[in-house]
Amino acid sequence: MTERLIDLAESAAYLRIRNRQLVIERHQSRDREGASSPAADRHPSPDDSDSQEDARAETSVPLAEVAALIVAHPQVNCSQPVLAELMQSGGAFIVCDSRSLPVGMMLPLNANVLQSQRLAAQASAPLPLKKQLWKQIVRRKILAQAELLTELRGGDHGLSDLVRTVRSGDPDNREAVAARRYWPVLFDDPNFHRRFDAPDANRLLNYGYAVLRAVMGRAICGAGLHPTLGLHHHHRENPFCLADDLIEPYRPLIDAAVVEHVAAGRGTELDRIGKQTLLEAVLARYSADGEVRTLFDLCARTAVSLVKVLEKQTDRLVYPKNLSEPRP
Protein backbone atom coordinates (compact mmCIF):
# COMPACT_ATOMS: atom_id res chain seq x y z
CA MET A 1 0.00 0.00 0.00
CA THR A 2 1.19 3.53 -0.78
CA GLU A 3 2.28 5.57 2.26
CA ARG A 4 1.83 9.32 1.90
CA LEU A 5 3.13 12.24 3.94
CA ILE A 6 0.98 15.29 3.22
CA ASP A 7 2.62 18.60 4.10
CA LEU A 8 0.16 21.52 4.12
CA ALA A 9 2.47 24.51 4.29
CA GLU A 10 2.17 26.47 1.05
CA SER A 11 -1.42 27.70 1.09
CA ALA A 12 -4.64 27.93 3.07
CA ALA A 13 -6.83 24.84 2.93
CA TYR A 14 -10.07 23.34 4.19
CA LEU A 15 -10.08 19.63 5.06
CA ARG A 16 -13.05 17.29 5.13
CA ILE A 17 -13.91 13.61 4.73
CA ARG A 18 -15.87 12.17 1.80
CA ASN A 19 -16.30 8.46 1.09
CA ARG A 20 -13.24 7.47 3.13
CA GLN A 21 -11.19 10.06 1.28
CA LEU A 22 -9.36 13.02 2.77
CA VAL A 23 -10.55 15.97 0.69
CA ILE A 24 -8.22 18.97 0.56
CA GLU A 25 -9.66 22.21 -0.79
CA ARG A 26 -6.78 24.63 -1.27
CA HIS A 27 -7.20 28.39 -1.46
CA GLN A 28 -4.28 29.78 -3.43
CA SER A 29 -3.21 32.33 -5.99
CA ARG A 30 -2.67 31.28 -9.59
CA ASP A 31 1.12 31.28 -9.26
CA ARG A 32 1.41 29.43 -5.96
CA GLU A 33 2.49 25.81 -5.81
CA GLY A 34 0.28 23.07 -4.45
CA ALA A 35 0.24 22.53 -0.70
CA SER A 36 1.08 18.84 -0.99
CA SER A 37 4.50 18.78 -2.55
CA PRO A 38 5.55 16.07 -5.00
CA ALA A 39 7.95 14.84 -2.34
CA ALA A 40 5.01 14.15 -0.07
CA ASP A 41 3.70 11.55 -2.53
CA ARG A 42 6.13 9.48 -4.53
CA HIS A 43 3.31 8.48 -6.89
CA PRO A 44 2.40 11.81 -8.55
CA SER A 45 -1.26 12.54 -8.99
CA PRO A 46 -3.34 15.59 -9.91
CA ASP A 47 -3.04 16.92 -6.35
CA ASP A 48 0.73 17.23 -6.84
CA SER A 49 0.77 19.50 -9.89
CA ASP A 50 3.32 22.30 -9.71
CA SER A 51 0.74 24.99 -10.43
CA GLN A 52 -3.00 25.36 -10.31
CA GLU A 53 -5.05 27.54 -12.59
CA ASP A 54 -7.99 27.83 -10.23
CA ALA A 55 -7.90 29.87 -7.05
CA ARG A 56 -9.50 26.86 -5.37
CA ALA A 57 -8.16 23.40 -6.08
CA GLU A 58 -9.86 20.35 -4.61
CA THR A 59 -7.98 17.07 -4.40
CA SER A 60 -8.54 13.86 -2.47
CA VAL A 61 -6.41 11.07 -1.02
CA PRO A 62 -7.59 7.69 0.36
CA LEU A 63 -7.45 7.86 4.14
CA ALA A 64 -5.82 4.45 4.29
CA GLU A 65 -2.80 5.86 2.42
CA VAL A 66 -2.21 8.85 4.72
CA ALA A 67 0.70 7.98 7.01
CA ALA A 68 0.93 11.50 8.41
CA LEU A 69 -0.75 14.85 7.86
CA ILE A 70 1.60 17.76 8.57
CA VAL A 71 -0.06 21.16 9.03
CA ALA A 72 2.16 24.26 8.97
CA HIS A 73 0.04 26.92 7.23
CA PRO A 74 -1.89 29.10 9.73
CA GLN A 75 -5.06 29.02 7.61
CA VAL A 76 -5.69 25.29 7.42
CA ASN A 77 -9.12 24.40 8.81
CA CYS A 78 -9.58 20.85 10.10
CA SER A 79 -12.79 19.46 11.63
CA GLN A 80 -13.27 16.82 14.34
CA PRO A 81 -14.40 14.14 11.84
CA VAL A 82 -11.16 14.59 9.90
CA LEU A 83 -9.06 13.96 13.00
CA ALA A 84 -11.24 11.07 14.18
CA GLU A 85 -11.20 9.24 10.84
CA LEU A 86 -7.49 9.89 10.35
CA MET A 87 -6.82 8.25 13.72
CA GLN A 88 -9.14 5.34 12.91
CA SER A 89 -7.18 4.79 9.70
CA GLY A 90 -3.90 4.64 11.60
CA GLY A 91 -2.52 8.00 10.47
CA ALA A 92 -0.64 10.63 12.47
CA PHE A 93 -1.44 14.34 12.72
CA ILE A 94 1.45 16.81 13.14
CA VAL A 95 1.04 20.54 13.77
CA CYS A 96 3.86 23.05 13.22
CA ASP A 97 4.69 26.48 14.63
CA SER A 98 5.33 29.72 12.72
CA ARG A 99 8.82 28.48 11.81
CA SER A 100 7.33 25.32 10.23
CA LEU A 101 8.87 23.20 12.99
CA PRO A 102 6.64 20.40 14.37
CA VAL A 103 5.45 21.18 17.91
CA GLY A 104 2.63 18.67 18.44
CA MET A 105 1.53 15.23 17.33
CA MET A 106 -1.61 13.08 17.59
CA LEU A 107 -1.45 9.29 17.23
CA PRO A 108 -4.08 6.51 17.10
CA LEU A 109 -5.17 5.20 20.50
CA ASN A 110 -6.67 1.85 19.52
CA ALA A 111 -4.42 0.48 16.78
CA ASN A 112 -4.03 -3.09 18.05
CA VAL A 113 -6.53 -5.59 19.45
CA LEU A 114 -3.98 -6.87 22.00
CA GLN A 115 -3.21 -3.41 23.31
CA SER A 116 -4.22 -4.03 26.95
CA GLN A 117 -2.07 -7.14 27.21
CA ARG A 118 0.93 -5.47 25.61
CA LEU A 119 0.60 -2.26 27.61
CA ALA A 120 0.67 -4.32 30.80
CA ALA A 121 3.89 -6.01 29.68
CA GLN A 122 5.36 -2.66 28.70
CA ALA A 123 4.48 -0.99 32.01
CA SER A 124 5.92 -3.86 34.06
CA ALA A 125 9.20 -4.18 32.16
CA PRO A 126 12.03 -4.48 34.73
CA LEU A 127 14.78 -1.86 34.81
CA PRO A 128 17.61 -4.31 33.97
CA LEU A 129 15.78 -5.25 30.77
CA LYS A 130 15.31 -1.60 29.82
CA LYS A 131 19.00 -0.97 30.36
CA GLN A 132 19.96 -3.91 28.17
CA LEU A 133 17.65 -2.68 25.43
CA TRP A 134 19.08 0.82 25.66
CA LYS A 135 22.56 -0.69 25.28
CA GLN A 136 21.41 -2.35 22.05
CA ILE A 137 19.91 0.91 20.77
CA VAL A 138 23.00 3.00 21.52
CA ARG A 139 25.26 0.43 19.88
CA ARG A 140 23.13 0.35 16.74
CA LYS A 141 22.99 4.15 16.62
CA ILE A 142 26.76 4.59 16.93
CA LEU A 143 27.33 1.84 14.36
CA ALA A 144 24.97 3.59 11.93
CA GLN A 145 26.84 6.86 12.51
CA ALA A 146 30.14 5.07 11.87
CA GLU A 147 28.80 3.63 8.61
CA LEU A 148 27.68 7.08 7.45
CA LEU A 149 31.02 8.71 8.27
CA THR A 150 32.85 5.92 6.45
CA GLU A 151 30.66 6.42 3.40
CA LEU A 152 30.89 10.22 3.31
CA ARG A 153 34.24 10.99 4.94
CA GLY A 154 36.31 7.88 4.27
CA GLY A 155 36.59 6.72 7.87
CA ASP A 156 34.54 6.27 11.03
CA HIS A 157 36.87 8.31 13.30
CA GLY A 158 36.91 5.65 15.99
CA LEU A 159 33.16 5.16 16.32
CA SER A 160 33.28 1.43 15.53
CA ASP A 161 35.72 0.90 18.39
CA LEU A 162 33.46 2.94 20.66
CA VAL A 163 30.54 0.57 20.00
CA ARG A 164 32.29 -2.24 21.84
CA THR A 165 32.61 -0.14 25.01
CA VAL A 166 28.89 0.58 25.46
CA ARG A 167 27.62 -1.02 28.67
CA SER A 168 24.12 -1.79 29.95
CA GLY A 169 22.21 1.47 30.31
CA ASP A 170 25.17 3.37 28.79
CA PRO A 171 26.34 4.73 32.18
CA ASP A 172 29.51 6.10 30.52
CA ASN A 173 27.36 8.08 28.06
CA ARG A 174 29.12 6.68 25.01
CA GLU A 175 26.24 8.09 22.97
CA ALA A 176 27.40 11.63 23.81
CA VAL A 177 31.06 10.74 23.23
CA ALA A 178 30.15 9.50 19.77
CA ALA A 179 28.12 12.64 19.06
CA ARG A 180 31.06 14.91 19.88
CA ARG A 181 33.13 13.11 17.25
CA TYR A 182 30.34 12.59 14.75
CA TRP A 183 28.80 16.01 14.15
CA PRO A 184 31.91 18.10 13.36
CA VAL A 185 33.18 15.43 10.96
CA LEU A 186 29.80 14.84 9.32
CA PHE A 187 29.30 18.52 8.46
CA ASP A 188 33.03 19.17 7.94
CA ASP A 189 32.77 21.96 10.51
CA PRO A 190 34.68 21.77 13.84
CA ASN A 191 32.19 24.16 15.41
CA PHE A 192 29.01 22.30 14.47
CA HIS A 193 26.91 21.07 17.39
CA ARG A 194 23.37 19.81 17.76
CA ARG A 195 21.24 22.69 19.04
CA PHE A 196 17.48 22.79 18.67
CA ASP A 197 17.20 26.53 18.04
CA ALA A 198 20.34 27.08 15.96
CA PRO A 199 19.72 28.91 12.63
CA ASP A 200 21.69 26.42 10.54
CA ALA A 201 21.39 22.80 9.39
CA ASN A 202 19.87 22.02 12.79
CA ARG A 203 16.56 23.35 11.44
CA LEU A 204 16.49 20.67 8.78
CA LEU A 205 17.55 17.98 11.24
CA ASN A 206 14.79 19.02 13.66
CA TYR A 207 12.11 18.77 10.98
CA GLY A 208 13.36 15.44 9.68
CA TYR A 209 13.59 13.95 13.16
CA ALA A 210 10.06 15.12 13.98
CA VAL A 211 8.65 13.35 10.93
CA LEU A 212 10.70 10.25 11.77
CA ARG A 213 9.31 10.43 15.31
CA ALA A 214 5.78 10.41 13.92
CA VAL A 215 6.54 7.38 11.75
CA MET A 216 7.92 5.49 14.74
CA GLY A 217 5.08 6.65 16.99
CA ARG A 218 2.61 5.27 14.47
CA ALA A 219 4.49 1.96 14.41
CA ILE A 220 4.52 1.80 18.20
CA CYS A 221 0.77 2.30 18.42
CA GLY A 222 0.25 -0.25 15.66
CA ALA A 223 2.20 -2.78 17.71
CA GLY A 224 -0.09 -2.23 20.70
CA LEU A 225 2.42 -0.28 22.79
CA HIS A 226 2.22 3.22 24.27
CA PRO A 227 4.66 5.88 22.99
CA THR A 228 4.91 7.57 26.41
CA LEU A 229 6.45 4.65 28.33
CA GLY A 230 10.10 4.77 27.32
CA LEU A 231 13.09 2.53 27.86
CA HIS A 232 15.57 5.35 28.52
CA HIS A 233 13.92 8.69 27.78
CA HIS A 234 11.66 9.58 30.69
CA HIS A 235 11.10 13.33 30.89
CA ARG A 236 7.75 14.00 32.53
CA GLU A 237 6.77 16.48 29.80
CA ASN A 238 7.63 14.15 26.91
CA PRO A 239 4.62 12.12 25.70
CA PHE A 240 6.70 10.22 23.11
CA CYS A 241 9.58 8.80 25.14
CA LEU A 242 9.45 5.37 23.53
CA ALA A 243 9.41 6.85 20.03
CA ASP A 244 12.48 8.90 20.93
CA ASP A 245 14.18 5.72 22.16
CA LEU A 246 13.47 3.57 19.13
CA ILE A 247 14.26 6.13 16.41
CA GLU A 248 17.87 6.62 17.53
CA PRO A 249 19.49 4.16 15.06
CA TYR A 250 17.38 5.61 12.23
CA ARG A 251 18.49 9.22 12.75
CA PRO A 252 21.53 8.89 10.44
CA LEU A 253 19.12 8.44 7.52
CA ILE A 254 17.95 12.01 8.15
CA ASP A 255 21.52 13.16 8.77
CA ALA A 256 22.59 11.82 5.38
CA ALA A 257 19.74 13.63 3.61
CA VAL A 258 20.61 16.93 5.30
CA VAL A 259 24.33 16.65 4.51
CA GLU A 260 23.55 15.92 0.86
CA HIS A 261 21.11 18.85 0.74
CA VAL A 262 23.62 21.31 2.20
CA ALA A 263 26.51 19.99 0.08
CA ALA A 264 24.41 20.58 -3.05
CA GLY A 265 24.33 24.28 -2.21
CA ARG A 266 20.64 24.39 -1.29
CA GLY A 267 21.25 26.17 2.00
CA THR A 268 19.87 25.44 5.45
CA GLU A 269 16.50 27.18 5.26
CA LEU A 270 13.48 25.09 6.18
CA ASP A 271 11.77 25.96 2.92
CA ARG A 272 9.80 23.87 0.45
CA ILE A 273 12.93 22.39 -1.12
CA GLY A 274 14.38 21.53 2.27
CA LYS A 275 11.20 19.79 3.36
CA GLN A 276 11.03 17.95 0.05
CA THR A 277 14.52 16.53 0.64
CA LEU A 278 13.54 15.26 4.08
CA LEU A 279 10.18 13.84 3.06
CA GLU A 280 11.86 12.01 0.19
CA ALA A 281 14.26 10.42 2.69
CA VAL A 282 11.36 9.25 4.86
CA LEU A 283 9.33 7.95 1.91
CA ALA A 284 12.24 6.21 0.19
CA ARG A 285 12.80 2.48 -0.07
CA TYR A 286 15.98 1.18 1.54
CA SER A 287 18.07 -1.89 0.89
CA ALA A 288 18.92 -3.72 4.11
CA ASP A 289 19.71 -7.32 4.99
CA GLY A 290 19.09 -8.43 1.41
CA GLU A 291 15.63 -6.85 1.18
CA VAL A 292 14.23 -3.56 -0.08
CA ARG A 293 11.76 -2.02 2.36
CA THR A 294 10.20 1.30 3.30
CA LEU A 295 11.12 3.14 6.47
CA PHE A 296 7.54 2.60 7.64
CA ASP A 297 8.05 -1.15 7.42
CA LEU A 298 11.45 -1.01 9.10
CA CYS A 299 10.05 0.98 12.02
CA ALA A 300 7.12 -1.42 12.33
CA ARG A 301 9.54 -4.35 12.53
CA THR A 302 11.48 -2.62 15.29
CA ALA A 303 8.31 -1.92 17.28
CA VAL A 304 7.08 -5.50 16.90
CA SER A 305 10.47 -6.82 17.99
CA LEU A 306 10.10 -4.83 21.21
CA VAL A 307 6.77 -6.55 21.81
CA LYS A 308 8.49 -9.91 21.40
CA VAL A 309 11.16 -8.89 23.91
CA LEU A 310 8.54 -7.78 26.43
CA GLU A 311 6.67 -11.06 25.94
CA LYS A 312 9.94 -13.00 26.45
CA GLN A 313 9.99 -14.46 22.94
CA THR A 314 13.43 -12.99 22.22
CA ASP A 315 16.03 -10.73 23.82
CA ARG A 316 16.99 -8.68 20.75
CA LEU A 317 15.52 -5.63 19.10
CA VAL A 318 15.40 -5.75 15.31
CA TYR A 319 17.22 -2.99 13.44
CA PRO A 320 18.40 -3.17 9.82
CA LYS A 321 22.12 -3.50 9.17
CA ASN A 322 24.05 -1.70 6.45
CA LEU A 323 21.23 0.46 5.11
CA SER A 324 22.10 1.52 1.58
CA GLU A 325 21.18 4.59 -0.41
CA PRO A 326 17.44 5.06 -1.04
CA ARG A 327 16.01 3.41 -4.12
CA PRO A 328 13.31 5.13 -6.20
Task: State what each model feature region is.
Residues M1-R4, S49, V71-H73:
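A short linear-motif detector with a strong N-terminal bias
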Residues A12, H27, D50, D54-E58:
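Positively charged, polar, low-complexity stretches
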Residues R30-A40:
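Intrinsic, low-complexity polybasic segments
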Residues E53-L114:
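Glycine/small-residue-rich interface belts in oligomeric ring/scaffold proteins
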